[in-house]
Amino acid sequence: MEAQTLYATGKRKTAIARTWMKPGSGKITVNGKDADAHFTTNAARIIMRESLKITETLESYDVDIRVIGGGITGQAGAARHGISKILAGLDPEMRQKLKANGFLTRDARVKERKKYGQRGARARYQFSKR
């Protein structure tokens, strides 16, 4: 009998992470390669593994993540969100830990749009009095 594979989707900024998890040795793959090869910055690696560390399941599950869009930080946040959603469904005690750390909340902060008549979202064109 094949081990049960769990699935969840995580989002952050413009990144979308489809996450599959099954009992295993703690191997994490992102887009077909090792997580440390995909996430080049140490901060992104830490963000991605945070939910597994807090619930003490880092060595208990194999995680496969397919992530599209966004940058490195957005992709790491999306991966963490997806992993957290799976772990929350497994055990109510884990859900409490994840919720207390804010890992189950979809981070709604996205880039503010550029407005017409302005240089950027908030920046104005230089004003000349005379």
Curated annotation (Swiss-Prot):
UniProt GO BP: translation
One family name in Pfam for this protein: Ribosomal_S9
Keyword tags: Ribonucleoprotein, Ribosomal protein
Cited InterPro entries: Ribosomal_Su5_D2-typ_SF, Ribosomal_uS9, Ribosomal_uS9_bac/plastid, Ribsml_uS5_D2-typ_fold_subgr
GO MF, one example: structural constituent of ribosome
Transmembrane segments: none
Superkingdom to which the source organism belongs: Bacteria
GO terms under cellular component: cytosolic small ribosomal subunit
Database matches in HAMAP family: Ribosomal_uS9_B
NCBIfam families linked: PRK00132.1
Family from the record: Belongs to the universal ribosomal protein uS9 family.
The protein, known as: Small ribosomal subunit protein uS9
Organism, as annotated: Desulfosudis oleivorans (strain DSM 6200 / JCM 39069 / Hxd3) (Desulfococcus oleovorans)
